[in-house]
């Protein structure tokens, strides 16, 4: 009986993307999986779907299939010798798999029954400036796979047992014939039904359908380290996805997003504060109160202080998240020029300019001043 076109088997077009092929395979394999579908012919249908996906999901195999069809290339390489061809296109394993089939060597396959650690997960956590600076405790809710509560992660319906896999007869592998440069070769692949374990369920768990896991919202308490900065992360061991075959759970990585402060600017462990002072304070000097992370302190402004002058308060910054002391607090001075002053203040400023030997060409600051000078004939 002639094989059906692989694209037809999966119900996709020949221009289908990898994602479209994967989506079609998942839908069909779930529909015809022998553990779920007990109808006559479902077993053969599942084999056909698995075979089609194995070829179309691999770029080299797919290109070979598109060019030569099911039978592979005929007549070798058309007299071109090896010609630098990519031999991985013939069966997907290249020379290594070919000679493995003859001599029993080649790559060592990972034991499918060996314990495997679960996948690591990542969660982005937004915290305030104060929570990051001083540390805090917060509870988060994430959606993740956990061991099925019905079968306790076994995947089988409670009260039932595992049986020898009907697809591979308990070997955990199936034989696959491949067209290679050395002719038609039989190789072994991991069984797609039992994933190499050699066993399948008498009856899959009705809750998780044999997966052994279910997706749930889980609440987790997170300790925000004192001094944590934007984009830094912490690892919560064992809070990731469940392991397989008795393997440990994966880890959960918390990545922090720190909201900016309305008062300070942060650069690592250092913080910056912009302080506005008047012309009089800058000229004569003063003592002013400035905020820090832990209350206010008095700062001495020397006479003659200029805009952009910077004062440094040692160890008044943020505690280093790794425990390497504290950063500094930098005070940036901004001398503010008044926009509204009285006539008396103007008179004093003119007098100051005269004493200093300055000749001013005063300019009106608004329409009212312009009108006043116009009617005075100035």
UniProtKB/Swiss-Prot annotation:
Cofactor note: Binds 2 Zn(2+) ions per monomer.
SMART domains linked: DnaJ
Protein name per UniProt: Chaperone protein DnaJ
Subunit structure: Homodimer.
Mapped CXXCXGXG motif repeat ranges: 148-155, 165-172, 191-198, 205-212
Function description: Participates actively in the response to hyperosmotic and heat shock by preventing the aggregation of stress-denatured proteins and by disaggregating proteins, also in an autonomous, DnaK-independent fashion. Unfolded proteins bind initially to DnaJ; upon interaction with the DnaJ-bound protein, DnaK hydrolyzes its bound ATP, resulting in the formation of a stable complex. GrpE releases ADP from DnaK; ATP binding to DnaK triggers the release of the substrate protein, thus completing the reaction cycle.
Single GO MF annotation: unfolded protein binding
Annotated J domain residues: 5-69
Needed co-factor(s): Zn(2+)
Gene Ontology biological process terms, A to Z: chaperone cofactor-dependent protein refolding; DNA replication; protein refolding; response to heat
Written domain comment of the UniProt record: The J domain is necessary and sufficient to stimulate DnaK ATPase activity. Zinc center 1 plays an important role in the autonomous, DnaK-independent chaperone activity of DnaJ. Zinc center 2 is essential for interaction with DnaK and for DnaJ activity.
Pfam families membership: DnaJ, DnaJ_C, DnaJ_CXXCXGXG
Gene Ontology CC annotations of this record: cytoplasm
Sites where the protein binds Zn(2+) 1: 148, 151, 205, 208
Listed InterPro entries: DnaJ, DnaJ_C, DnaJ_domain, DnaJ_domain_CS, HSP40/DnaJ_pept-bd, HSP_DnaJ_Cys-rich_dom, HSP_DnaJ_Cys-rich_dom_sf, J_dom_sf
Keyword Metal-binding: yes
Binding sites annotated in the UniProt record for Zn(2+) 2: 165, 168, 191, 194
ZnF locations on chain (CR-type): 135-217
């Amino acid at each position: 009986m002639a094989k059906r076109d692989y694209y037809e088997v999966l119900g996709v077009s020949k221009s289908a993307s990898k994602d479209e092929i994967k989506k079609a395979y998942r839908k069909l394999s779930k529909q015809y999986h022998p553990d779920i579908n007990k109808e006559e012919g479902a077993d053969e249908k599942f084999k056909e779907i698995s075979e089609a996906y194995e070829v179309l999901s691999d770029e080299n195999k797919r290109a070979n299939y598109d060019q030569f069809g099911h039978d592979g290339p005929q007549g070798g390489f058309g007299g071109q010798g090896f010609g630098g061809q990519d031999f991985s296109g013939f069966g997907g394993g290249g020379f290594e798999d070919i000679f493995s089939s003859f001599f029993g060597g080649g790559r060592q396959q990972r034991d499918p029954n060996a314990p495997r650690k679960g996948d690591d997960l990542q969660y982005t956590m937004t915290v305030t400036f104060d929570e990051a600076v001083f540390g805090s405790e917060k509870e988060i809710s994430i959606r993740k796979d956990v061991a099925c509560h019905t079968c306790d992660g076994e995947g089988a319906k409670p009260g039932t047992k595992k049986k020898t896999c009907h697809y591979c007869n308990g070997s955990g592998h199936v034989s696959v014939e491949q067209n290679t440069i050395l002719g038609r070769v039989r190789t072994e692949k991991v069984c797609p039904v039992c994933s190499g374990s050699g066993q399948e369920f008498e009856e899959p768990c009705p809750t998780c359908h044999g997966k052994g896991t279910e997706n749930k919202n889980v609440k987790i308490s997170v300790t925000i380290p004192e001094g944590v900065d934007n984009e830094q992360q912490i690892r919560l061991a064992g809070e990731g996805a469940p392991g397989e075959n008795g393997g440990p759970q994966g880890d959960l990585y918390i990545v922090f997003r720190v909201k900016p402060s309305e008062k300070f600017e942060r650069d690592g462990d250092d913080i910056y504060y912009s302080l506005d002072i008047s012309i009089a304070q800058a000229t004569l000097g003063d003592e002013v109160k400035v905020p820090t992370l832990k209350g206010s302190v008095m700062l001495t402004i020397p006479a003659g202080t200029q805009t952009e002058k910077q004062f440094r308060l040692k160890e008044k910054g943020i505690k280093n998240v790794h425990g390497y002391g504290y950063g500094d607090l930098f005070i940036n001075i901004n001398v503010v020029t008044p926009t509204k002053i009285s006539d008396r203040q103007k008179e004093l400023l003119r007098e100051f300019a005269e004493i200093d030997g300055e000749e001013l060409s005063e300019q009106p600051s608004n329409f009212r001043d312009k009108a006043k000078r116009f009617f005075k004939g100035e």
